[in-house]
Amino acid sequence: MNKIIQFVLILAVGLVLYFLLNRMMQKLMVELSEILYKEVNPEKYLQVLNGWKGKMFFSKKTRSLMAIDALLMQNETAKIEEIFEQLDAVKMNPGNKLGLAQKEVSFYIDTKQFDKALKAYDTLKEIAAKFNNPQVESILKECTFLVEIYIHHNTEILDELLDLAGKMSNPFYQGIFLYRAAKLYYFKQDEENCRKLLEEAKEKLQGTAWEVMIRQMLEENPALVAER
């Protein structure tokens, strides 16, 4: 009887610890999201992510993957490429591999490494084909937009792109999509709407390296949008 009681007590304590730790992890993820996307504070985000709480709940590979968005805001291209090389060389579950390919498509397009972008896009399509859920389809669609905008300059998707940007709740990503729509207006030789969307994107991207870049375009030459 004593052994049964001990087993029940150990099981009960284990369950309490499991739910407590799970709640702490969820709370940390909410905290990190608010720091990065509401406060737009990538430096603080990385400090918390790589602090004791981040190390407690996330593996080194996961933390590297989670760091990419913050490093994008800081325009730390060398660090991002280093992370991509490290993560491409290790085994990851399909979900993380999908997230990595998504970030690679975006990054390599932004840095005009189009061969690498198309390679990552092919990888993304292969992984996405193994899933059957709306979230994965949304990720694939977003990356298809990037390929069509930056590599093929396809202005036919402009209305769809603007509709997607309007539905986004995250100001950082909304700003990025508005900026990309501005590019398409430039490719259509519509400078008025190009400038208008650059202004809107700048407001959404306050406090980031993107804001500085867009401000320079508006002050010097909106045609720079075609190159960046």
Please give the residue ranges for each predicted region.
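Alpha-helical repeat scaffolds
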Residues: 43-52, 77-89, 113-129, 153-168, ...
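Acidic, Ser/Thr-rich low-complexity segments on the non-lumenal side of membrane proteins
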Residues: 44-75
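Structural register within alpha-helical repeat arrays
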Residues: 31-32, 67, 104, 144, ...
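Boundary/linker segments of alpha-helical solenoid repeat arrays
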Residues: 57-61, 92-98, 128-137, 169-175, ...
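Structural motif corresponding to the intra-repeat A-B loop/turn of tetratricopeptide repeats
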Residues: 39, 74, 111, 148-152, ...
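Residue at a conserved register position within TPR or TPR-like alpha-solenoid repeats
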Residues: 35-36, 71, 108, 148, ...
